[in-house]
């Protein structure tokens, strides 16, 4: 594949961002999307339209820039390497060095994949011992190997076909999760189950098994059992297949988890409390799996599908998260949750709920498995296409 060497400054304009004063409410609450690297944490889609925050015109003028549609957004610090494409005009904070593409030279979608495929190289341009950062000047000087526009478009088309399938499955999962949440909230509003439920402490229906501690040597392996860990818990609940590690150390039988088991995060690496207290159901992973010490397994005679919904959709997890403490890393003492009171419906209602929601959980797991497979296929293709080892006809 023939390529031309450019500096990034040759193929687009590198633009930083800014943060209007958060102390001034007059700057915020408009309709102009403003994102920070936090909005891209765990973000899987190629395109992004907005994050959690919005500016008004006064806020825009006070300290940031409006980037046009199709700008390639690149987080240049805390951390380096989040990438997305603006699907509409958008602002960023100072944690970005974004690229407004010269479309006569570079296809924005191709550049998105090029950056994804060359992150290790690009990260070398970061400076700073504690929090490495790529400066605007350094970003502009980074050299890239770019093929012709028709070849760029073909490569982008191949890779984006995988991402469209991934995003379609992701949308279906969101709909299924919303349906499950709606059913839970409709069925278990207190006034609807009054007289058919009992107030109990969690310790009356659950016991807790702590996961195992491990050394770096025990996960520095290419063969072993699955180690389900904190990265397998999605923010506010749900299971992530891509967080699994391999582990070749010892474990106790009670630390094994199987399909349908319920786990909870008892640590959080940030103060956001998105993970601590959150729960997930183990899908079918076809390999012996054990849990790490930052998780617990929740054991109960009550169906785990109901308990999962109770923790996640009944706000029990959010309540539990408030018991976690720590200056930098949050820790939750597992036994501290056992005295929390919950409302338990009678068995007939639980069984009826489970019969409706369990098939949704199974479908969510299947769609997540498809996403994992598509992601691995795309990630195998990406370096081969970018290097020219896999030739495409333009």
What are these regions (language model features)?
Residues 1-18, 141-213, 343, 347-389, ...:
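Non-catalytic DNA-recognition/assembly elements of restriction-modification systems
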Residues 5-25, 38-69, 87, 92, ...:
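Sequence-specific dsDNA recognition surfaces
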Residues 21-29, 127-128, 198, 215-223, ...:
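Short coil/turn segments at secondary-structure boundaries
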Residues 36-38, 51-116, 229, 253-316, ...:
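A short beta-sheet element
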Residues 76, 90-98, 128-156, 287-294, ...:
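A short glycine-rich beta-alpha junction/loop motif
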Residues 103, 119, 123-126, 166, ...:
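Structural signal for hydrophobic packing residues in well-ordered secondary-structure cores
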Residues 115-119, 123, 163, 315:
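Short amphipathic alpha-helical signal-transduction/dimerization elements
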